[in-house]
Amino acid sequence: MKLSGVELRRVQMPLVAPFRTSFGTQSVRELLLLRAVTPAGEGWGECVTMAGPLYSSEYNDGAEHVLRHYLIPALLAAEDITAAKVTPLLAKFKGHRMAKGALEMAVLDAELRAHERSFAAELGSVRDSVPCGVSVGIMDTIPQLLDVVGGYLDEGYVRIKLKIEPGWDVEPVRAVRERFGDDVLLQVDANTAYTLGDAPQLARLDPFGLLLIEQPLEEEDVLGHAELARRIQTPICLDESIVSARAAADAIKLGAVQIVNIKPGRVGGYLEARRVHDVCAAHGIPVWCGGMIETGLGRAANVALASLPNFTLPGDTSASDRFYKTDITEPFVLSGGHLPVPTGPGLGVAPIPELLDEVTTAKVWIGS
């Protein structure tokens, strides 16, 4: 398959409500979308970078630059590409996993559409729907938090994740447990906001029966997570630290992780995400699919990934209306706490042209 070119779009999508984490507050999702064009058809990719280098060292302007000047030209120069060849073709360029993952996603979508095969079938799906959790941002007050959590439980979400930071950890967890009981599947996400010196404070979460605490320490501090695992009872889940299947294997060997959050963009694409899944399965480590406030394009691919056998915990694969009043694809709608796995060719969804145009702020064509 020869790549004819790639259209790169900048889009801005307003969120239904501001989303606050330990590294900042978002009210608009700014992201990059890629449309890969081949003689056999086209495919879509979504780059999960943010406007600034806060969650990750990658960010939108940097991703656009490396895509335009290095990654896309490298694929255009290749005589024959498949999704499996994207990573080797781009290996000489260091880092930029999110940008590489978006390009691989677009090529994979084009390839699978041409062969009338779905993402789910290609990745190894074993179910036709996936259970959905929801991520709840840091709130101004406990009553506000309880109202929001209650609303999501009423909608049918089967797991609640609370974002935490120093000063907003034990009390919100206690309040949710007291209001909604011990049967609610509950976990917390620190987004690297703590240090090993905070272990006594994090141990205060142990009595609440949490599923996990996600990425409490800096992403490079794998040994610190291993030590923290010895000091607290709540299982440690790694997110930012897991950038590849090798990183997952190393963290498992060091005893730094009991559960893994797989984010395809963070590991360089859906094919590497499947390898992370396989490594974890081989070591008896359960996984779940994280989210990056994706559009319906990324959501479709994530739901397909989450239908693999070792995804045994509900992920952040929320319905479209969790973040967006209007998505750029047909919306994903929660039913019985689950989302359906797309079965159409490729992603199984595509942007609705008029909706995509409404949120597009710039676009450029790279190719012949």
Swiss-Prot record:
Its cofactor is a divalent metal cation. Variants with increased racemase activity could be used on an industrial scale for the production of enantiomerically pure alpha-amino acids. The keyword Metal-binding applies. Changing S22R: 3-fold increase in OSBS catalytic efficiency and 4-fold decrease in NSAR catalytic efficiency. InterPro entries: Enolase-like_C_sf, Enolase-like_N, Enolase_C-like, Mandelate_racemase_C, Mandelate_racemase_N_dom, OSBS/NAAAR. It comes from the Bacteria. Binds 1 divalent metal cation per subunit. Enhanced by the addition of divalent metal ions such as Co(2+), Mn(2+) and Fe(2+). 2-succinylbenzoate binds at S135, K161, L162, K163, N191, I293. Changing D140R: 3-fold decrease in OSBS and NSAR catalytic efficiencies. It catalyses: N-acetyl-D-methionine = N-acetyl-L-methionine; (1R,6R)-6-hydroxy-2-succinyl-cyclohexa-2,4-diene-1-carboxylate = 2-succinylbenzoate + H2O. GO terms for biological process: menaquinone biosynthetic process. Mg(2+) binds at D189, E214, D239. Inhibited by EDTA and sulfhydryl reagents such as p-chloromercuribenzoic acid. Both OSBS and NAAAR activities are inhibited competitively by salicylhydroxamate. Keywords: Isomerase, Lyase, Magnesium, Metal-binding. Changing K163 to A/R/S: Significantly impairs both NAAAR and OSBS activities. Optimum pH is 7.5. NCBIfam families: menC_lowGC_arch. The active-site cavity can accommodate both the hydrophobic substrate for the OSBS reaction and the substrates for the racemase activity. Accommodation of the components of the N-acyl linkage appears to be the reason that this enzyme is capable of a racemization reaction on these substrates, whereas the orthologous OSBS from E.coli lacks this functionality. PANTHER family: O-SUCCINYLBENZOATE SYNTHASE, O-SUCCINYLBENZOATE SYNTHASE-RELATED. Acts as a N-succinylamino acid racemase (NSAR) that catalyzes the racemization of N-succinyl-phenylglycine and N-succinyl-methionine. Can catalyze the racemization of a broad range of N-acylamino acids, including N-acetyl-D/L-methionine, N-propionyl-D/L-methionine, N-butyryl-D/L-methionine and N-chloroacetyl-L-valine. Also converts 2-succinyl-6-hydroxy-2,4-cyclohexadiene-1-carboxylate (SHCHC) to 2-succinylbenzoate (OSB). Catalyzes both N-succinylamino acid racemization and OSB synthesis at equivalent rates. NSAR is probably the biological function of this enzyme. Belongs to the mandelate racemase/muconate lactonizing enzyme family. MenC type 2 subfamily. Homooctamer. This is N-succinylamino acid racemase.
